[in-house]
Regions:
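Bacterial N-terminal signal peptides that target proteins for export
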Residues: 1-8
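Carbohydrate-interacting regions of secretory-pathway proteins
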Residues: 23-302
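Bacterial N-terminal signal peptides
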Residues: 8-18
């Protein structure tokens, strides 16, 4: 009887050891790297020009608004970007009071970025009366403040109420398979449409195929996959936009856009991010391979 008890105990201990070893092995082989911590140690903050309605101690606007200077790097007096701990994990709070960019210290080539995001309540000028707005900028290159005195040149995965995943080309360009659909006035609008001809976007917006945004206050999962000059925008598991042939500008001879930093915008709306993580990506998963056009057409620019 004692031998049976000892045997049962030994089996139990062995099972426990094997279970722990398997869990530890899985953790050790995980390629996801968390990018968010209480000190934002993997990021730097650049704050743009405050709206005249937002008082900032020590800041004076120029007589000519075009000559207003951004607050600049590591100068965030209103604490636009802060981190708080919620249930033991860091949550990035973006007040939206002033346009800004939270910029990764590292540049990335092939990557899979995954975040959870939700809207807050407050909105600020000049975005009052407009949809809440934010954005995940990637393939960022060049100087801080190159775009609107605040952001770097980049491709943008738009994060805006009811159209998360749109493409905005802020200095970078990319091609999207898309078709025209009715716009307002003389503006042409384009929507990503699988199998449609490729068109070049250099500053204009390529609307997503479909949106699966959860109600305000709920956490959405946003993913950006980028390999070489191609990328995907994914919202809550659904592909919203497919980009390819990205370059550093519309002029002939501009180099292919295959690496860069990541920026998270502040753009007039309160919001939160959590579980910001990234992993290397050598190629797109098999289920996404067929989404890209097999040809590099010479598209016209909308």
């Amino acid at each position: 009887m004692k031998m049976k008890s000892w045997f049962a105990l030994a089996v139990g201990l062995t099972t426990c050891v094997r279970t722990l070893t398997a869990a530890e092995t899985a953790a050790a082989t995980s390629t996801w790297t968390p990018l968010l911590d209480p000190n934002l140690s993997q990021w730097e903050i650049f704050i743009g020009v405050p709206d005249v309605s937002i008082p900032v101690p020590g800041y004076t606007h120029a007589a000519n608004p075009k000559q207003d200077k951004p607050l600049g790097l590591t100068n965030d007096p209103l604490h636009v970007y802060t981190v708080r701990m919620v249930d033991g994990e860091p949550v990035l709070h973006i007040s939206g009071e002033i346009f800004g960019g939270l910029t990764s210290l590292k540049s990335y080539d092939g990557f899979h970025l995954r975040v959870q995001f939700r809207w807050g309540i407050n909105k600020f000028a000049p975005k009052l009366g407009k949809p809440r707005d934010n954005g995940i900028l990637y393939r960022c290159f060049g100087a801080h403040g190159a775009v609107n005195h605040v952001w770097k040149h980049c491709l943008e995965c738009q994060v805006q109420e009811n159209d998360i995943g749109d493409l905005f080309s802020l200095g970078g360009i990319a091609e999207v398979a898309c078709r025209e659909y009715p716009g307002t006035g003389t503006n042409k609008l384009w929507r990503y449409t699988p199998g449609a001809p490729l068109r070049l976007f250099g500053g204009r917006c390529a609307r997503g195929l479909d949106y699966h945004e959860l109600p305000n206050g709920e956490w959405n999962t946003i993913e950006v996959m980028a390999v070489g000059d191609r990328s995907l925008h994914i919202l809550n598991g659904h592909v919203v936009n497919v980009l390819q042939n990205a370059k550093k500008g519309v002029e002939a001879g501009k180099p292919t856009l295959v690496s860069g930093q990541i920026q998270i915008q502040s753009e007039g709306a309160e919001c939160e991010y959590r579980r910001i993580e990234i992993q290397p990506l050598a190629d797109f998963p098999a289920e996404y391979q067929g989404l890209f056009s097999a040809t590099n057409a010479s598209p016209s620019q909308p």
